[in-house]
Amino acid sequence: MRLAAAALLLTAQAAWGPREALKRHEAEHDAAHAKEAAGDVAHLAEAVETRRGTVAAIKKTGVDMYGDKKAIDAVKDLQAATRRYLFAKYGQADSYTLDLQIKFPESMGGDRDIVTIETAPVALMPHAVHVFLDAAITRKGETWRCAFHRNAGHVLQAFLRAPGARGLAFQEYDAQFPHERLTLGFAGRPGGPEFYISTVDNVRNHGPGSQGSKTEADSCFAKVVSGADVVERMRKQPAPKGLGFVNNKADYIVVEDVQLRPPA
């Protein structure tokens, strides 16, 4: 293989000159590497999808996902496969940092600002992190939409609509990453990709044993690391008391884009 590559390089040098031949050789090598990497990501995605289906099927039976051995084993298998996929797709990192580009409605000034979030450690919450990155980053396109449409007393809730995006297969949760103030959780159960920012400590409201469940919790998948002042301003979004759903779409706080920072 090496002899063949060397012969090809020498032939190219004769035709284009050493510098041009080297550049072409490097480009072909990079293209081959990119194709191989894409193939690896696709293979890992298939592995995640298979395991996700298994976990979702178990979840539908109504068993305790934190107490049933079959469920625990299936979840561990899904989490391991998801970590491998995340590292191949988004880069090796303990967690990922993203910038949410916020646009306030005209009723709040119409200006823009940024809220920066850091995901939960991949070691703890790979499935939840994957669901968010898939919807917020991978599936962005012309019909992608995200906006905060609920201002309740304890959360700011946003819809996240991306073609093909799905929610959680189960409520992944780890007590080491609880629903403290300025964390992000998935709305609904299993929940997602719609999410909320906790504006108060919501461990009791959304943690284990909440909302009628003896053991389960909302998934908590990220925290605000910059822009707490922006979040505080968002709490002034016009909304009726009670459930806090914004009646006038013109008063939505729009997330115009989400940018994933390169892993450090």
Task: Map each language-model feature to its residues.
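Cyclophilin-like peptidyl-prolyl cis-trans isomerases
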Residues: 16-264
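Cleavable N-terminal signal peptides of Sec/SRP-targeted secreted and luminal proteins
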Residues: 2-17
